[in-house]
Design a protein with these regions (language model features):
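Structural signature for solvent-exposed beta-strand/loop edge elements and short helix-capping sites
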Residues: 1-205
């Protein structure tokens, strides 16, 4: 009971169409231009559902008058901004599941089909793309000049990305370049581009 009251006493919420408080389900449902603020967290979305018993918030898109999905979630914590299709966040342990997210870290554009937020500084990526060569769309019409396609990776915001198996794509076309792992350093002190491991370089010289 105490934990529940702490969340409700400190969270700010608003929506332009409806705010439904379901006391039986212990939920607050916000629809259309929904927004919540809690500590250093700001979440906006078409639909937000706050479970104040479990201290979990979920957010997703809504359909417009033409049946098109709109009002994608925007999750901001500190200086980190993520734009996913949907998100589920736990206020107690600060962990989150984030679907189809787009974000930017020090000049690197990052797209991930599933992201697990471990805490406010560590994210685990699955089936993602990383580039400094343009905007990532996530479909067949990629605008980026090139990108690295990753299966799994670890992101430290403001820092580095370490990945497992990685493929290089140029103009959305796969190249023969495949690496068992790759290291993408922070771009804060670099002009552009990546450093990737040169496998067996010493043996080739």
């Amino acid at each position: 009971q105490e934990k529940k009251s702490v969340l409700l006493d400190n969270v700010k919420y608003d929506a332009s169409d409806s705010i439904i408080i379901d006391q039986k389900q212990n939920k607050i449902i916000l629809y259309n231009n929904a927004k919540i603020e809690y500590d250093d967290i700001v979440l906006t979305s078409g639909l937000i559902i706050l479970d104040y018993k479990e201290n979990i918030v979920t957010a997703g898109r809504i359909s417009d008058i033409n049946g098109e999905l709109s009002q994608y979630p925007t999750f901001t914590q500190g200086g980190n901004v993520v734009n996913p299709d949907s998100i589920k966040y736990n206020f107690d342990n600060q962990k989150a599941l984030i679907w189809n997210s787009k974000s930017e870290e020090n000049g690197m554009n990052i797209l991930s089909s599933l992201t697990k937020k471990q805490n406010d500084s560590v994210y685990y990526l699955k089936d993602g793309k990383v580039t400094t060569g343009g905007n990532l769309m996530g479909d067949e019409s990629e605008e980026a000049d090139y990108f690295f396609k990753i299966r799994k990776g670890k992101l430290v915001p403001g820092g580095n990305i370490i990945t497992g198996f990685t493929n290089l794509f140029v103009k959305n076309v796969p190249t023969p370049i495949g690496l068992p792992f790759a290291y993408f350093p922070s771009q804060q002190t670099r002009d552009s581009g990546f450093i990737i491991p040169n496998i067996n370089e010493s043996n080739q010289r």
